[in-house]
Amino acid sequence: MSKKSTFIILAAGEGKRMKSKYSKVVQKIMGKPMILYIIDEIEKNFEDGRIVVVVGNKKEDVYKVLEGRNVRFAYQEKQLGTAHAVMCAMSEISDDSEDVFVLYGDVPFIKADTLKKLSQKRKEEAAALCLLTAIFENPYGYGRIIADENGNVLKIVEERDATEEQRKIKKINPGFYCFEKQELVNVLSKIDNKNSQNEYYLTDAIEILNRSGKKVVKVTVEDNFEVMGINSRYELFVAEQELKLRINKEHLSKGVQIIDIYSTYIHPDAQIGKDTVIYPGTFILGKTSIGEDCVIGPQSYIVDSKIGNNCHILFSVIENSEIKDNVKIGPYAHLRPNSLLEEGVKIGNFVEIKNSKLGKNTKSAHLTYIGDADIGENVNLGCGTIFVNYDGYKKHRTVVENNAFIGCNSNLIAPVKIGENAYVAAGSTITEDVPANALAIARERQTNKEGWVLRRKQMYENR
């Protein structure tokens, strides 16, 4: 049987510096809860990995974000230190695990390649533990790595306990560990809380292992962004700005043109085709996919939507919708959830669409509400058309078949069907089905009252 890995993610902290009623690890970075960055990275790269999340304060927030994910939970009722958190998770470790990784839910950008290097180095050196180190030009506040001439880690000295000479050391401990499972079990039984905080520190494991003749080795991270901890609103801001630029640069390298990488927000899970142009002030969020040769923005907001090739979306909001090729939207249009625009559709300014399908080459140029509708191909919806879908108790659907023409300022009272090639005269309120090829007129006949203005004027002058 192949050996597996267990990943313990510590997420029980109070997060006081974040000043939030929500758990720190569910705070969003580029629209994605930070703990999901770690979960996704593990799931994509460690097929047999078991994930154990240690929760404590505000645990319901973490449960909600991870609902439906293949993770196990361990509960740390009292926060008694990092080693204590790991102790709480030990019952969830798989029996056939060889490597046990300890990670942090508020250090979200660690990469799978770095974790694999920890495992590889530990095995090559037959070590009990391989820990990750980083080199910081300003190491203030971090524990310093004390190593021998062969690079073996002897201990970690915290900032408050370090001598002046030790404080000059720039190699620090960001807190990522890869233990051999049985060695972790053994060392946890030897860690005590005889310190000023009465807590169980996982860093004590290093000296305990060394005293037992066990080997402790290290790997230095190549990109310090991977070990960036996020504890405050400012650190959340800094992390988001850096991640935003990295995401945008990656899209640039793949052939996407981003006019201003500083004012464009692209979710890490979004996909964009080459030769698409993104203008400033645009937000592309969630699992959105955008095809090639599109023009998006400026000032567009797109979330969890699928957009085809050669689409233009200007100053508009798109939510949970699908847009096929060669569609033009905006300015100031709003596609609400479950909308489908087939190829060649044109949607103009101040058009709102909700839970509706528009067939090929259908047009709605301006000032229209389309709710709960099934609209065919080559339909023209005149300015001011309203699909009246709600009777005060429930929603009803409207059907408009191919090649129909809806005149301006018309109301279609659902449920109603407009037949193929039918015309609805401008200003009509339609309450009954319109047959194919028919003209529907539902308005008061015009009456011209000759001389009325002069008579009215004379009446007021004679008062």
From Swiss-Prot:
Subcellular location: Cytoplasm
EC number: 2.7.7.23, 2.3.1.157
GO biological process: cell morphogenesis; cell wall organization; lipid A biosynthetic process; peptidoglycan biosynthetic process; regulation of cell shape; UDP-N-acetylglucosamine biosynthetic process
Annotated region (Linker), positions in chain: 234-254
Region (N-acetyltransferase) residue spans: 255-463
Binding site for Mg(2+): D106, N231
Cofactor binding, note field: Binds 1 Mg(2+) ion per subunit.
Annotated keywords: Acyltransferase, Cell shape, Cell wall biogenesis/degradation, Cytoplasm, Magnesium, Metal-binding, Multifunctional enzyme, Nucleotidyltransferase, Peptidoglycan synthesis, Repeat, Transferase
Catalytic activity of the protein: alpha-D-glucosamine 1-phosphate + acetyl-CoA = N-acetyl-alpha-D-glucosamine 1-phosphate + CoA + H(+); N-acetyl-alpha-D-glucosamine 1-phosphate + UTP + H(+) = UDP-N-acetyl-alpha-D-glucosamine + diphosphate
Catalytic residues in the record: H366
UniProt xrefs under InterPro entries: Bifunctional_GlmU (IPR005882), GlmU-like (IPR050065), GlmU_C_LbH (IPR038009), Hexapep (IPR001451), Hexapep_transf_CS (IPR018357), MobA-like_NTP_Trfase (IPR025877), Nucleotide-diphossugar_trans (IPR029044), Trimer_LpxA-like_sf (IPR011004)
Pathway where it operates: Nucleotide-sugar biosynthesis; UDP-N-acetyl-alpha-D-glucosamine biosynthesis; N-acetyl-alpha-D-glucosamine 1-phosphate from alpha-D-glucosamine 6-phosphate (route II): step 2/2; Nucleotide-sugar biosynthesis; UDP-N-acetyl-alpha-D-glucosamine biosynthesis; UDP-N-acetyl-alpha-D-glucosamine from N-acetyl-alpha-D-glucosamine 1-phosphate: step 1/1; Bacterial outer membrane biogenesis; LPS lipid A biosynthesis
Root EC class: transferase
Cofactor(s) required, per the database record: Mg(2+)
Residues reported to bind UDP-N-acetyl-alpha-D-glucosamine: 10-13, 24, 76, 81-82, 104-106, 143, 158, 173, 231, 336, 354, 369, 380
Binding site for acetyl-CoA: N389, Y390, A426, R443
GO molecular function: glucosamine-1-phosphate N-acetyltransferase activity; magnesium ion binding; UDP-N-acetylglucosamine diphosphorylase activity
Annotated stretches, region: Pyrophosphorylase: 1-233
GO CC terms, sorted: cytoplasm; membrane
Coarse class of the protein's main subcellular location: cytoplasm
Superkingdom of the source species: Bacteria
Similarity comment text for this entry: In the N-terminal section; belongs to the N-acetylglucosamine-1-phosphate uridyltransferase family. In the C-terminal section; belongs to the transferase hexapeptide repeat family.
Subunit details: Homotrimer.
Task of the protein: Catalyzes the last two sequential reactions in the de novo biosynthetic pathway for UDP-N-acetylglucosamine (UDP-GlcNAc). The C-terminal domain catalyzes the transfer of acetyl group from acetyl coenzyme A to glucosamine-1-phosphate (GlcN-1-P) to produce N-acetylglucosamine-1-phosphate (GlcNAc-1-P), which is converted into UDP-GlcNAc by the transfer of uridine 5-monophosphate (from uridine 5-triphosphate), a reaction catalyzed by the N-terminal domain.
Name of the molecule in the record: Bifunctional protein GlmU
Gene: glmU
